[in-house]
């Protein structure tokens, strides 16, 4: 997969119940997101950074490509997605899900898949 031009701030591309940044510095950041049962982080990938998900409350479902995979996470579970691996994040339960996503090391971008 060739590097595609991504956006530096994806907050306007999809809706969440709550978004907060706990750490942000060049090459690394930690965001906390809360999504309702009907919300999702759409299909995308990152050219340079790895996403590491840590579930605080509720359940997440991650769908991945290259290779195709589905991962279910509950409170205390973690999962890392390597750079350039397309993924979609959905709520895997009936209540809101809250999770941390650690992103780095490298320049952040968000490349949406059409």
Labelled PLM ranges:
Residues 1-31, 42-43, 112-114:
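A short, N-terminal "cap"/entry segment at the start of jelly-roll beta-barrel domains
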Residues 26-28, 36-39, 59-61, 68, ...:
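Short, charged/polar surface micro-motifs in flexible loops or helix N-caps
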Residues 34-36, 46-62, 102-104:
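Short, conserved beta-strand element in jelly-roll/cupin
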Residues 67-83:
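Short acidic-glycine-tyrosine-enriched beta hairpin
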Residues 22-29, 38-54, 66-67:
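A short beta-loop-beta micro-motif enriched in histidine and acidic residues
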Residues 75, 83-109:
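Ligand-binding loop in jelly-roll beta-barrel domains
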């Amino acid at each position: 997969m060739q590097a595609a031009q991504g956006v530096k701030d994806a907050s306007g591309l999809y809706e969440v119940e709550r978004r907060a940044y706990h750490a942000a510095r060049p090459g690394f950041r930690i965001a906390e997101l809360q999504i309702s049962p009907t919300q999702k982080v759409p299909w995308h990938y990152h050219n340079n950074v790895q996403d590491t998900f840590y579930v605080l409350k509720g359940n997440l479902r991650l769908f991945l490509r290259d290779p195709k995979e589905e991962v279910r996470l509950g409170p205390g579970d973690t999962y890392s997605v390597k750079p350039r691996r397309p993924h979609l994040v959905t709520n895997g339960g009936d209540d809101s899900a809250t999770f941390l996503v650690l992103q780095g090391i490298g320049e952040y971008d968000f490349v949406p898949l059409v």
